[in-house]
Amino acid sequence: MAEASPRTETSTDDTDENLMLEPGNAALAVVSDSSDRSRDKNGDQKTMRRLAQNREAARKSRLRKKAYVQQLENSRLKLTQLEQELQRARQQGIFISSSADQSHSMSGNGALAFDTEYARWLEEHNRQVNELRAAVNAHAGDTELRSVVEKIMSHYDEIFKQKGNAAKADVFHVLSGMWKTPAERCFLWLGGFRPSELLKLLSTQLEPLTEQQLSGICNLQQSSQQAEDALSQGMEALQQSLAETLAGSIGSSGSGSTGNVANYMGQMAMAMGKLGTLENFLSQADNLRQQTLQQMQRILTTRQSARALLVISDYSSRLRALSSLWLARPKE
């Protein structure tokens, strides 16, 4: 019984030590619980931030979608306005009709038809010139020569008529001389030869000429030069006027607005009207060429007229030959 007491003491001491350690355990538990709550709180904050970011991203996405839809709507309205303006312009005769593609096709066919007709004309012209050359070399009489000369002059009238018809389909094709060889185009003036230059060439090739003939050719050359200058000045004025019309509203802001569309259509209508005078310029130039040939025939004798036609033909033939030689030259 005496030995039992120390064990009891020891047991009591252990109990006391355990009791003394219990506050520490409680503190550790408190710290652990606080840490858990802090982690939960931080996790909640991160979640809230992510939710806020998602809401902001969704809001911006909705705004972008709304702006895109509005842009599409504005574009649709602007397109509708343009279509209405174009429709009104067509009804008023300001704009080219909806058959523009068909007109372009007809224009292209007209140019092609003229090129074909010109090739046939040139073939027949060369045949007639060879006939005239043979008659001159054979010292044929004036009656025979006059018959061939008149035939060639009538043949020239035919090409002038064909050019006039072709110009109605495509005046640019005829005016630019696309139906000629490159070398011929270099010397082209308003879709053909320059009458004053032709007379200058003939005056040196038809000697001897009487004083009356020289005076007649000189006067014809001066009048032709004056007419050429007037037509050239008219073409320059037309080009300047066209440039001013087309450049009228370039660079203006809000090009899609209704007012600017109407202004654009009006300017195109003015430009189209001015381009319509090109056919008139070409017609006047061809009339001058035709009259020059006729006046030349009146001034010269039949034999001189025959020689003049041969000179004109030989000069044109040499230009065509020059084009062929140039195109066939060795390329380095």
UniProtKB/Swiss-Prot annotation:
Binds DNA as a dimer. Residues 72-86 are annotated as: Leucine-zipper. Residues 34-47 have a biased composition (Basic and acidic residues). Residues 47-142 form a coiled coil. PROSITE patterns: BZIP (PS50217), BZIP_BASIC (PS00036), DOG1 (PS51806). Residues 44-107 form the bZIP domain. Its main location: nucleus. This is Transcription factor HBP-1b(c38). Belongs to the bZIP family. It is found in: Nucleus. Residues 1-48 are annotated as: Disordered. Pfam families: bZIP_1, DOG1. Residues 111-329 form the DOG1 domain. Residues 46-66 are annotated as: Basic motif. It comes from the Eukaryota.
